[in-house]
Amino acid sequence: MVNQSSPMGFLLLGFSEHPALERTLFVVVFTSYLLTLVGNTLIILLSVLYPRLHSPMYFFLSDLSFLDLCFTTSCVPQMLVNLWGPKKTISFLGCSVQLFIFLSLGTTECILLTVMAFDRYVAVCQPLHYATIIHPRLCWQLASVAWVMSLVQSIVQTPSTLHLPFCPHQQIDDFLCEVPSLIRLSCGDTSYNEIQLAVSSVIFVVVPLSLILASYGATAQAVLRINSATAWRKAFGTCSSHLTVVTLFYSSVIAVYLQPKNPYAQGRGKFFGLFYAVGTPSLNPLVYTLRNKEIKRALRRLLGKERDSRESWRAA
């Protein structure tokens, strides 16, 4: 069946019934996007320039920052255009590209956050063997697996979603082209797509989240066996930032991809979708830097607020 909507594209409704809210959201989204660009670029730059950040933890953090930059850039420019003006259309090709990239990068983040939880588990529970277990080659392998698996997932799910028989009104009740909103737009049988969405949600959302919780459960047990307040504070400082990011990201993803079928849940899902597409990438740099002394020190050096010689910089 030929997709009748492909010549004209789609109409992204967003919150078009509330023009005043759209103006406010434009300012919020634009500000968040700027914070995302500046914050994540700084983390990548510091991870490259500062030798003490040449470790697995910051390798994965810089990978997450690069991912967040791509993640937001794939959808925010189109979102800003739709929020600012009366034109809220997106071409079929544009929707296809956005869906493919957004789905791939979102899946990558789910897997990468799991890898980072494993890294923190080894750092806390196996500190003496950390360098042996989490070596540079393994870091590259784990990061590559995350990107390749997400690419395969997007290659499988994107075509089947775009080949649905869409309703003639072509109105997507969302800010961007996502699998759940496109399934709701279909006027045909969506049983296969709903099963596919459920299976992929279990594999790439439920399973990674379960592994993250299991790793932190094991980490908590190991920390409780240590009768040292200093060790507790160090373990908390090591894991709290990542656990905060996991909570923000996964709570939003679950609200979008595992929501019940009712109008209230779908309306609420738009807010959560907006948050995990725009909010979490802008908050991630803040969360990771607020309690991280190494990144703070590197940032002060980059800004010239610490007058260290070139030799002390290299020695660090």
From Swiss-Prot:
Spans within the Cytoplasmic topological domain: 48-55, 119-137, 218-234, 291-316
Domain of life the protein comes from: Eukaryota
Transmembrane residue ranges: 24-47, 56-77, 99-118, 138-156, 194-217, 235-257, 271-290
Molecular function (Gene Ontology), one example: olfactory receptor activity
Cellular-component GO terms for this entry: plasma membrane
PROSITE patterns assigned to the protein according to its UniProt record, in alphabetical order: G_PROTEIN_RECEP_F1_1, G_PROTEIN_RECEP_F1_2
Residues linked to a glycan: N3
Keyword Disulfide bond: yes
Disulfide bonds: C95-C187
Primary location recorded for the protein, binned into one broad class: membrane
GO terms, biological process: detection of chemical stimulus involved in sensory perception of smell
UniProt xrefs under Pfam families: 7tm_4
InterPro entries: GPCR_Rhodpsn, GPCR_Rhodpsn_7TM, Olfact_rcpt
Subcellular location: Cell membrane
Topological domain ranges for the Extracellular compartment: 1-23, 78-98, 157-193, 258-270
Function: Odorant receptor.
Family under the similarity heading: Belongs to the G-protein coupled receptor 1 family.
Record protein name field: Olfactory receptor 2H1
Organism: Homo sapiens (Human)
Gene: OR2H1
